[in-house]
Amino acid sequence: MTSEFFAKILIILIRLYQILISPLFAPCCRFYPSCSEYAIIAVRKHGLSKGSRLALIRLFKCHPFHPGGYDPVR
């Protein structure tokens, strides 16, 4: 199995989160795009390994003491 296959699985799991779990909470993401959308873009653009790493870094920045704002995938 290739990393491309696992990248697609990860994207499906993130989409399921967006559809099933995210609506249960108030919209409070301090970033644009949202962290889940950022993760999908990062995995599509950089592949599974680097994209996942970028998504994790973004999640660690998501806390009340970070100002948030526009943070595109680079």
From Swiss-Prot:
Q: Which UniProt keywords apply?
A: Cell inner membrane, Cell membrane, Membrane
UniProt feature coiled coil, ranges: none
| Topology of the protein relative to the lipid bilayer | Peripheral membrane protein
Does the entry feature the keyword Disulfide bond, yes or no? no
* Cell location: Cell inner membrane
InterPro entries in the record: Membr_insert_effic_factor_YidD
Q: Could you say which protein family the record assigns here?
A: Belongs to the UPF0161 family.
Q: Which HAMAP family match?
A: UPF0161_YidD
Q: What is this protein called?
A: Putative membrane protein insertion efficiency factor
The species is Syntrophus aciditrophicus (strain SB)
